[in-house]
Amino acid sequence: MFTGIVEDIGIVQKIEKENENVHFTLSCSFTKELKIDQSVAHNGCCLTVVHIDGDQYTVTAIKETMVKTNLGDWKEGAKVNLERCMTLGGRLDGHIVQGHVDATAICVEVEDQGGSWKYTFEYSGDDVTVEKG
């Protein structure tokens, strides 16, 4: 579970395809604090740490993740919003979110409302809150 509050900006260092899976190697300020099998939200998508090497770590996205998210658009050098999972007893500064992405949307309008912004999105598909979980 995550709060939805971005903790750091990571950099995609390497992208490797293996059959239908894609391995992403990233660097960020908290890499040395990560552990294998830990969940990290990447642009809101929950991915599991599978390898750590110095100041870089690797996560793997399966075919369904690649289809339902924008991870397929990532390039080496891309900046990625990161958040480590919540801990029991920690502060909840945002909202409880899963990090399980079911679809992507297109931003069709951005409106300046004098100090805040209104975003309007369109998406296709069923009106399903959580398809799988």
Language-model features, listed with the residues they occupy:
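Conserved loop->alpha-helix
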Residues: 1-133
